[in-house]
């Protein structure tokens, strides 16, 4: 099985650091998350284990419709489509990127990505990756998230085991929402990373690797 690691916004595949497997740069795969999933499914030979953080989790879920997914991990990621309010927020984010640039985007998003007491080196590394992104590609990513399809039915119908993980202080996915998503799946479970924000794979890489290994050992 090929392990496919799908990155969060506004980063790229480097956020996964030393992890093994395939880690594509999503923005360059096309204009929509479904196109991303189709491209990945076409390029990966054989069964897939998909590990997606935030935006990458949206892609992991769409892979259920296009590829042979044997297990998947969603980190800080939800299954429903954007509400009108979230779509409006995406539009504002696109305008921010286009008018003020990537650094302004980072300054706006940083408080939601990491808790105040997050390790400064971790935050600095994340910032460095974010600031190297192409503004047009980031805008494409935001539009893809805005227009993504609801994946609830895919999660509910698949036989593939799913781990729904989140940081304790993640503002984008509550504990109740994570539990509900895992409960909707036929074989779902949850894990909460204590003290973390939206990106536990960056804040707690050793714990993340251990949790991932334990989950996959049980698949």
Predicted regions and their residues:
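Conserved alpha/beta-hydrolase catalytic His-Asp/Glu region
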Residues: 82-85, 100-157
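Flexible "cap/lid" loop of the alpha/beta hydrolase fold
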Residues: 61, 65-107
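Conserved HGGG/HGGXW glycine-rich cap/lid loop of the alpha/beta-hydrolase fold
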Residues: 1-34, 38-39
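Catalytic histidine neighborhood in serine/cysteine hydrolases
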Residues: 183-198
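Catalytic histidine-centered segment of alpha/beta-hydrolase-like enzymes
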Residues: 196-209
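Gly/Ala-rich beta-loop-alpha elbow adjacent to hydrolase catalytic centers
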Residues: 52, 56, 60
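Short beta-strand/loop motif that positions the catalytic acidic residue
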Residues: 158, 164-166, 170
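Conserved alpha/beta-hydrolase "acid-adjacent" motif
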Residues: 171-177
């Amino acid at each position: 099985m090929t392990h496919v690691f799908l990155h969060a916004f506004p980063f790229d595949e480097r956020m996964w650091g030393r992890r093994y497997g395939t880690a594509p740069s999503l923005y360059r795969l096309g204009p929509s998350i479904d196109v991303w999933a189709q491209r990945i499914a076409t390029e990966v030979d054989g069964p897939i284990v998909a590990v997606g953080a935030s935006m990458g989790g949206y892609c992991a879920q769409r892979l259920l419709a296009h590829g042979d997914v044997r297990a998947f991990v969603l980190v800080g990621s939800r299954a429903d489509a954007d509400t009108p309010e979230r779509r409006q927020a995406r539009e504002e984010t696109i305008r921010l990127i286009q008018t003020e640039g990537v650094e302004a985007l980072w300054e706006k998003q940083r408080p939601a990505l990491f808790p105040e007491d997050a390790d400064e080196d971790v935050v600095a590394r994340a910032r460095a990756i974010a600031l190297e992104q192409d503004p047009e590609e980031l805008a494409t990513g935001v539009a893809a998230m805005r227009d993504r399809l609801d994946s609830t039915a895919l999660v509910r119908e698949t036989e593939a085991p799913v781990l729904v993980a989140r940081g304790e202080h993640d503002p984008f996915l509550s504990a109740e929402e994570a539990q509900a998503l895992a409960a909707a799946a036929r074989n779902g479970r949850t894990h909460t990373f204590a003290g973390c924000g939206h990106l536990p794979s960056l804040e707690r890489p050793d714990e993340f690797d251990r949790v991932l290994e334990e989950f996959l050992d049980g698949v």
